[in-house]
Design a protein with these regions (language model features):
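Short amphipathic alpha-helical "interface-anchor" segments enriched in bulky aromatics
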Residues: 14-16, 66, 321-354
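An internal, acidic/charged active-site-proximal segment
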Residues: 192-299
């Protein structure tokens, strides 16, 4: 049974007019491997459709295209390649062309004042975090992240500890947090560099990502929030130089700062307020941190079941309200709980579609594009999704069913 969501599907169809997705996909080029005869735009549109439908493998995309003829309906005037041609085409796509579509989509959302009121207390907050997307003991690709893992193996009937090399795709992502749509602004890979496999330092990759974001989107972002791994001299300096404020968790990797703060806080009387079924006490003061002033806040939080936790937070904005800092540091979990969880388990970011560096980046950019479009549609353009009584994935599947029945005419009118 197909539910008629006439108003919703009309809004969904308007996305292509707002963000000009298929027109931009038509302009995607290949890197000109002469052995491949299929157009870059055809490969790109087919791959985008597969990612938009959240397909779990290249095999599924090909099966729904050629055997079940579902996607073929969307491209009546184009010859879609079979498996080997499609894979070779993905490897040859220009990833910069796809990245530009992502940037243009986010700029359009900004132009449409999607975040006019910020995401937390009037501030637009971006969370930074690194994660492993997928890994393999067998497959290896250029610039993957390598590490040694000790595993138990049965050899000649005896259990032995064997050290094996593990290859994984590790990236630092930037995502808008505090309020949905929680769109992804970009990512940077953490790689192994040098002949000895020396690993890059995640905060350095985060710095590169911040610079990339500033170059792509300019002004508009107010705060970068991150875990304790990012709290260091270089990161704090770069965040401020790019014109942002940083709100960063403080843990044992900055032991001296914690000890200095604790010494001061013992002499202070705690301030207290209630927020979201929690009683929150806090102490705060301004400290010198690598030639710059920062505000350090200690929170002692007790929930309605009596459970307690203490957290220390650093803010590079010494004038930021302690209640706002608390909201921001808790919003940091959005990128993991909503972002990474959905991307890995619902958008299949944890699956290695093709173990080749350019293909990995092409597919990641396509996953970003499809994820962001759904976020913008559901939480930005619908306005009433929270009152529908349906899960996000259940709703997406309903809309896509209608989309296929209508042969995607509003999106693929030139080929339908």
């Amino acid at each position: 049974m197909i539910i008629k969501r006439t108003k919703d599907i009309k809004t969904f169809n308007s996305l292509n007019k707002i963000y000009h997705i298929t027109a931009q996909l038509d302009n995607i080029n290949r890197k000109k491997n002469k052995k491949i005869r299929i157009k870059g735009s055809t490969v790109a549109k087919t791959l985008f459709t597969g990612m938009f439908f959240r397909e779990k493998s290249i095999n599924q995309i090909m099966e729904k295209t050629h055997k079940r003829k579902l996607y073929q309906k969307l491209f009546k005037n184009e010859a879609i390649p079979k498996m080997h041609g499609f894979v070779d085409g993905i490897k040859d796509l220009n990833v910069n062309d796809i990245e530009k579509i992502n940037i243009n989509t986010i700029k359009k959302a900004k132009e449409n004042k999607m975040y006019r009121n910020g995401t937390i207390d009037g501030l637009l907050v971006v969370g930074l975090d690194g994660t492993e997307t997928f890994g393999s003991y067998k497959k290896k690709w250029n610039n993957c992240y390598n590490k040694k893992i000790k595993n138990k193996k049965i050899i000649n009937g005896e259990e032995q500890i064997i050290e094996e090399e593990y290859h994984e795709q590790v990236s630092v992502f930037a995502r808008i947090v505090g309020k949905r749509p929680g769109i992804l602004l970009g990512y940077e890979k953490v790689t192994s560099k040098g002949n000895k496999g020396k690993q890059e330092y995640e905060p350095n990759v985060g710095i590169n990502l911040i610079k990339k974001i500033k170059k792509a989107y300019g002004i508009g972002i107010d705060v970068i929030v991150g875990d304790a791994i990012y709290l260091g001299k270089k990161f704090v300096k770069e965040v401020k130089e790019e014109g942002y404020h940083g709100v960063i968790r403080l843990k044992g990797n900055n032991k001296n700062l914690i000890e200095d703060a604790e010494g001061i806080f013992k002499k202070q009387k705690a301030k207290q307020y209630n927020y979201k079924k929690k009683t929150i006490q806090y102490w705060s003061d301004i400290f010198e941190y690598y030639d710059t002033e920062v505000k350090v806040v200690k929170y002692s939080e007790t929930d309605d079941k009596g459970r307690k936790q203490e957290i220390y937070v650093v803010s590079t904005d010494v004038n930021m309200n302690e209640k706002t800092i608390n909201k921001i540091i808790h919003a940091r979990w959005d990128i993991e709980n909503n972002g990474f969880h959905e991307l890995k388990h619902q958008w299949n970011m944890n699956h290695c579609y093709i173990a080749e560096e350019n293909a990995i980046d092409v597919i990641m950019q396509m996953i970003m594009l499809s994820y962001n479009l759904w976020e913008l549609y559901i939480y930005g353009h619908l306005h009433n999704f929270e009152n529908m009584g349906i899960t996000k994935i259940g709703y997406i599947e309903e809309i896509m069913m209608i989309f296929i029945v209508n042969k995607g005419k509003a999106w693929y009118s030139s080929s339908a």
